[in-house]
Amino acid sequence: MKIDNVEIITCPAGWRAWDFLRVSTDTGIVGFSDITDSNGAAPAVIAAVKMFGESILGRDPRQYEQVYSDLYRSSRQSAGGVVHKALAGIDNCLLDITAQSFDVPVYALLNGPSRDTVDLYWSHCATTRVRHAAEVGQTRPTALTDFESIGKEVSDTGYRAAK
């Protein structure tokens, strides 16, 4: 099995874009990862992924630890947030591909699950409504009672927490 394509998919989402990485193999197995950066570094993350992506073409994705190590060593003088974000996206794709090739969940490659359940929270709930009410089809909250209503909506939807 060899990596034969590395593609960045940018999905416009109103006021921002979401970036995903798609790594394909010659066997048809495809791995995906979110590489979105919300702190203004998206162009740098994308550039780093493209640079690293060229160097992994033809490599066996199941050798994910060696690939990661080689990429990290090649970037050791510019280690930091952008580089690590790019490396993490590639690593996630290679883990996804490897798990699919063995017909196991990714956690099986990482010494098993660390928990049986994962609590979810409603992320960016009120922040999105304050900053981008029109884009999400909501009214901008302005009073404490508006935020109380949002809290009730979060609870009524089944979430136990919001951010």
Region locations from a protein language model:
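Structured beta-strand/loop patches that form or line metal/cofactor-binding pockets in enzymes
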Residues: 1-38
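Short alpha-helix boundary/capping motifs
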Residues: 14, 88-89, 144
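Metal- or metallocofactor-binding catalytic centers and their adjacent structured scaffolds
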Residues: 26-102
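Glycine-rich, aromatic-flanked loop segments that form ligand/cofactor-binding clefts
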Residues: 91-132
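Metal-dependent enolase-superfamily TIM-barrel catalytic cores that perform enediolate-based chemistry
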Residues: 116-163
